[in-house]
Amino acid sequence: MIKILNSKSKNFDLALDKLLLARKNKIKLSSVSVAKIIEDVKKNGDKAIIKYEKKFNKNNIIMPTSKQINKSISLLDEKVKKAIDLAYSRIYQFHLLQKKKLSNISYTDKLKNKLEYKYVPLESVALYVPGSTVSYPSSVLMNAIPALVAGVKRIIMINPGQQGKQNSAVLYAAQKCKIKEIYSIGGPSAIAGVAYGTKKIKKVDKIVGPGNSYVAAAKKCGISEIYSIGGPSAISAATYGTKKIKSVDK
């Protein structure tokens, strides 16, 4: 439900301050909770991850089998597959052209010092793809394809599901991007798992992709290199003399 504040109301300033304070307190609270989860995963590894998966996602599976993945993909509507195929080809073409525009620099100065500037792909990267009750195959494509084009050797996906079941469209997009290492986990514990590494999860060099406020808080802890702190999408709209407020929420 969208929150509407009327600037003409007598209590507008107070209501706005209250809203901003509540958001600030939520961020502080999530940061404290996240720090405890990260420390738990650091000490107890897979055991801690499973504990939080059971608690938040009713899941006790860290890594789905190939059979489970293929079965899920087989249930996906062909129209959705074609849409993902089209998006993949367009995004891939763009980043391929982008790569061709990049050039290394190498020269020797008057003092015979050889100076170089090189573009070198990372060894490994983890894509965080939000899940549970929603589907974001676009997050897979937008984050995996640049890594694929760059030549990153190991691309893994962490995507929370409900009771171990992940979204078919997300899994198909991952398959399209040649991602063979897929984990059915999410939240701060997943971020900590790929950042520190566990017995089942090998650590990565970088973590990319959006997430909720708790995932964003985990990234802020500086436990791994990140692309950005992509938290939940938010919008604040100011309207003047219009009654079509509901249209903003669509």
Where in the sequence are the language-model features?
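Conserved active-site and cofactor/substrate-binding residues in soluble primary-metabolism enzymes
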Residues: 29-32, 36, 44-47, 79-82, ...
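Short secondary-structure capping/turn micro-motifs that flank functional sites
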Residues: 57-58, 163-164, 190-191
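N-terminal Rossmann-like NAD(P)+-binding subdomain of aldehyde/semialdehyde dehydrogenases
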Residues: 1-123
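Conserved NAD(P)+-binding/catalytic subdomain of aldehyde/semialdehyde dehydrogenases
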Residues: 178-250
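Flexible, glycine/proline-enriched loop segments at strand-loop-helix junctions
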Residues: 23, 38, 130-134, 155-161, ...
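Alpha-helical scaffold segments in soluble metabolic enzymes
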Residues: 36, 40, 51, 83-86, ...
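Glycine/charged-rich beta-loop-alpha catalytic/anionic-binding loops adjacent to active sites
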Residues: 121-130, 174-177, 198-201, 222
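Conserved small-residue-rich beta-alpha loop and adjacent elements
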Residues: 108-172
